Amino acid sequence: MAKVSQSIIKALEEEQMKQDLPEFAPGDTVVVNVKVKEGNRERLQAFEGVVIRVRNRGLHSAFTVRKVSNGEGVERTFQTHSPLVDSIKVKRRGAVRRAKLYYLRERSGKSARIREKLS
């Protein structure tokens, strides 16, 4: 019985997953368009920054984007397959040697730069 219910849950999760997502990795600069509801109207808000973390868990996948706004570091975590995430666009590929770029939190200016991946 457990295997049957697991397969049903897996089928339902795969049905809800988005198929049109670009491949991105930590170090990439992305623009995430998020649906924001203000009162009775809905608009798109763009959030551009460096991906510092990717969590691959099927339907529960998430990624964290960091940007510096007015001298203040802002991090936002998005659920990859959320209906609130309208689109993800990769602007620049970054060459990094780590899966989690938490060290960028302590850095600013030139030391926080990421080399561009040459491919």
Swiss-Prot record:
NCBIfam families: rplS_bact. GO terms for biological process: translation. One of its GO terms (molecular function) is structural constituent of ribosome. Belongs to the bacterial ribosomal protein bL19 family. Gene3D superfamilies: 2.30.30.790. One of its GO terms (cellular component) is cytosolic large ribosomal subunit. This protein is located at the 30S-50S ribosomal subunit interface and may play a role in the structure and function of the aminoacyl-tRNA binding site. This is Large ribosomal subunit protein bL19. The keyword Ribosomal protein applies. The keyword Ribosomal protein applies. Keywords: Ribonucleoprotein, Ribosomal protein. It comes from Idiomarina loihiensis (strain ATCC BAA-735 / DSM 15497 / L2-TR).
